[in-house]
Regions:
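Peripheral, non-catalytic segments flanking oxidoreductase cores
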Residues: 1-210
């Protein structure tokens, strides 16, 4: 299972949600040939991307973005390690083959006729280590604080959002807590975001005692 390619509007149901997400998206990962050892071994989320033949510029631009974020990931994790007062290179050998997926997400304007429990992305926390998110200027991202209140996380020019996931919460003994979030596109305009899930090598042993 590579989980690559395009998903249609309302084709994805977030775990625990009652209604499918009001979005469509295109997802890519590290491009690996069919004879790669991980692919031959049937390792999940490893393989080739599904590129549309009629849109060659998509492959060019997505690959460029994918590679740029791959440079950001190690620097962010270096900062995480410093903040935890552990070896700054703690994550390096856990990421010798990062499990990185990048998802370009399109949110249509959400009609007022839709019910209040219809979300662009239903409430959830990412299951991985860190998520690096670019979003356009239309807003719609909301995060839940410790009191259970939903607060807007409006886009800030020339910045990206970094979410801690469940894995980082476990790895850090909850010094980092995974961020529950959702999207409701009430802007009346199309919304675009690009999320990159930057996770360790598939075979990495995660031990909070480290």
């Amino acid at each position: 299972i590579t989980n690559r390619g395009w998903r249609a509007l309302r084709d994805a149901l977030m775990y625990g949600a009652e209604k499918p997400d009001y979005k469509e998206f295109y997802q890519v990962g590290l491009e690996l040939p069919s004879d790669d050892p991980d692919v031959l071994a049937g390792q999940p989320l490893r393989g080739a991307n599904n590129w549309p033949r009629f849109m060659p510029e998509l492959q060019r631009d997505m690959n460029a973005y994918f590679e740029a974020v791959a440079v950001c990931g190690p620097a962010l994790l270096h900062g995480v390690a410093l903040s935890l007062d552990i070896d700054p290179d703690f994550f390096v050998d856990k990421y010798f083959e990062p499990l990185q997926r990048t998802q370009a997400v399109y949110y249509p304007p959400q009609p007022v006729s839709l019910s209040d429990d219809q979300f662009g992305v239903a409430a959830h926390a990412d299951f991985g280590n860190i998520t690096i998110l670019w979003q356009d200027d239309n807003g719609g991202l909301e995060v839940q604080n410790l009191a259970g209140e939903w607060i807007a996380a409006p886009p800030v020019p020339d910045t990206m959002v970094v979410n801690a996931g469940d894995l980082l919460g476990r790895w850090s003994n909850d010094r980092y807590r995974s961020t529950k979030h959702r999207v409701v596109n009430r802007s009346g305009r199309e919304r675009i975001s690009i999320a990159t899930f930057y996770d360790p090598t598939f075979t990495t042993k995660v031990d909070p005692r480290d």
